[in-house]
Amino acid sequence: MKQFRINLLKVAITLSLLLICIPIFPQKHFSLKSPDEKLEVKIEVAQTITYSIAHQGDIVLNPSTIAMEIEGGKHFGINAKVTKEKRNKINQTITSPYYKKDKIEDTCNELVISFREGFHLVFRAYDDGVAYRFISSRKQDFIVKNEIAEFNVGATNRAYIPYVKTEQKSKTGQLFNSFENTYANTSVNQWEGERLAFLPLLVETTNNKKLVITEADLENYPGMFLENADKDATLKSFFAPYPKTMKQGGHNMLQELVTERKDYIAECRAKTLFPWRI
């Protein structure tokens, strides 16, 4: 009986130690609505960061993962710790001399989530759309190995897909293209193999509502392509790796052609503002 109690005590101690060693990631939930309150984006911060979008109760984007992989095995968005949040109401006029209108009204609600790992995540909710972007708060220059931008739009929803028009089969081979093609109209899970698509891309969602995926404020950073080689419900981002060597070529020798690439996508300054994902 005494030996049984000793063994039972050992088991209890072992289980206690195991429970202590298991990491616990408390979930944090955030919600942001458009000024007219018809659009709502929900953000969940746990082991990963996901967000979803609903319009008048209809889900137009299912929970989708976003993150950035930084050099040295670090991440923006993996096991991230929230330090604070800030909410703003934006109501301003933007002068636009190169657009069809000379002024644009910029009205939205904004949520800024700050993280211990050295970045902010900004969400904006407009009456007609949602956008997010990463902002670095790091004090030194750094390298971005990869960015994860997923769009869980539903496997059977139909999409208008602008595939890259090229004979190249590899992903890096498809990067050299004219960004011109007709749109293929097909269900998301009928995506054509390893083909990449450029932006914008449109998906028909619940109750005949449309979701357009694009980006903005793109500077010193690769443009986003989309792929769905798994033929499932989620479109995934793909970014051109950073050029390592180039040669002169193309039409009339007017272009620089990438002949070799590095194993990362961007070299960034401290406190970089990354492109908006819209």
Residue ranges with predicted function:
Residues 29-278:
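N-terminal accessory beta-strand-rich subdomains and adjacent acidic, glycine-rich linkers
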